[in-house]
Amino acid sequence: KVENILPKGLIAGDKAGILSEEGAKLLDPSGNLEAGIPLCPPEGDAGTGMVATNSVTRKTGNVSAGTSVFAMIVLEKELKKVYDEIDLVTTPSGDLVGMVHCNNCTSDLNAWVNLFKEFAQNFGVEDVDMDQLYGTLYNKALEGDKDCGGLLAYNYFSGEHITGFEEGRPLFVRKPDSNFNLANFMRVHLYTALGA
């Protein structure tokens, strides 16, 4: 049975035992890693984000956005059925959390910013400050039209489980009479990073 193979699930803060001699040798054949190190339940960025945003009580939640994006909501009660779109995880203290994860967030936007970096380097700017570049472009987006000047972008860089595609194809389109400028270009790519 799989239950006999997997370790028992523990809550953050529980003692999970100590590293055995056999385990130390498996992890570090050189012998530098010593046995006896106390172990604790593993924690990842999702749990860390919940704690950092104080989103650990029922009916609270947080969003983590980067190359991918996910929303985590601490559930008031258990779901009545299975939803393919929702992964169930727990808070560090064991409360049930509904997590929706998307592979696409800033990857396409990052690719465009890197294109601007390459452009600057071709004009002799060797050491491009990426913080300044992102800041400049993001602030420029604030000057864009509310409708992004008629520009349209689909930030479908990677495939998504929910759509059934293993690969994505990002897309940027405009009409001949769209208000095509830097502000609208950046604004539409910021919009699509979180909304497409």
Residue ranges and their predicted role:
Residues 1-3, 10-196:
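Active-site core segments that coordinate phosphate-bearing ligands/cofactors
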